[in-house]
Amino acid sequence: MINRRQALMSTLFGAGYVGLRALATGLPASILLNPRRALAGGPPAGCATTTKAQYILLNTSGNGDPINANVPGTYEDPKITHSLDPAMAPTSLTIQGQTYTAAAPWAALPQSVLDRLCFWHLMTNTPVHPKQPDVLKLMGATQAGEMLPSSLARHLAPCLGTIQSEPISQGASSPSEGLTYGGRALPIIPALALKATLTSPAGALTNLQPLRDQTLNQLYDLYRNGASPAGKAYIDSLVTSQQQVRSIQQGLLNQLTSIKDNTAPSQVLAALALIQMNVTPVIALHIPFGGDNHRDIGLQTETTQTVAGVAAIAGLMAQLASAGLADKVTFVSLDVFGRTLGPANTDGRQHNPNHQVSITIGKSFRAGVIGGVGPVGNDYGALSIDSKTGKAAPNGDIPPVTSLASFGRTMLAGVGLDPAVVSYEVGEGQVIASALA
């Protein structure tokens, strides 16, 4: 009988733990699965999107957090309610030479992060928590009902050479936050489970060096007698030395050992380890930003979690830079809905189907503010967007109801997908050209 650890190892590294062998040797899993073809022909055919391909860290919540209440674009109208806590004081920040106002935590981000930070004012068109999977499917706009993170993962996997094409969910706090791939529900792998599996005395990372030697020995005869000159040169350029393996092993062990729980900072550590092991192109996190705050006296929960949430993003960006991954990873957020903004929301906020703010931080997307917010019904909602400028416009060619699909199209375009593929994967909306770097 397969135990839980074996099942998790198989999920992470594939049958025969080929992904772990790839980590130990430096060789792509595709070579280990079919070494004869790889050795005979040299490097595999290149991916058309390699130069733009990114790992994606998706922050997603079925709670409908009030991110939309404290970002640029919400401070021009004095009737919009903000936390009065000094920690959330309206503060100026500069993005791409333009001055905006946001809650203090956003303004405290390093300028290097602000230079890549974009706020997207969108409409998800639902006030219902369990509709989170539908929002990730762009409310019916995706091909065959695929989730946006899964579509991204499927197209990015061959470009990044990841072990698997399925995304991984670490932070799901409810069933509605789980991911599907091709209609199949995917397992949730919390940070502590990843730590326990990989760092135990008999865990995967403690045996990388012997696994490297064993795998290369198995390939040696084929390498010596069956490899073309191009194949040998390609393999030689990829194989990790024993010293490199020791460095990889110790670095990942140190990183994972520091995980103490399943909170946002621990999810960040686990996600970085998964990227460094090249397991998957897309990892879903849950960083709280106020939660389902119907009753939130003085908006204190919103304040506390926004301060902590932005700090978690700052920590993530610092760790990406330290690991040399700042140009290889894009942070994206997408929640089921936002919260109400009007004057009656000083002690809590209600569900808002008309306004949700997403965030992107990465080299593929231009920093700034996409769209805007204005009065809608009894509260506020996202405004129409001009697809050429990205600005809110009364007669914009992207009405609020297609802003979510347009966001999805722009995400796919940003990581290098061909326009025809983008249109096929997301059948509504438009690419917002000004949002692309």
Annotate each predicted stretch with a short phrase:
Residues 47-52, 110-114, 159-162, 265-267, ...:
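Extracellular/periplasmic catalytic domains that process cell-envelope and extracellular macromolecules
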Residues 61-65, 124-128, 172-176, 289-292, ...:
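Solvent-exposed loop/turn segments at secondary-structure junctions
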Residues 217-322:
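Anion-binding catalytic surfaces of enzymes that hydrolyze or transfer phosphate/sulfate esters
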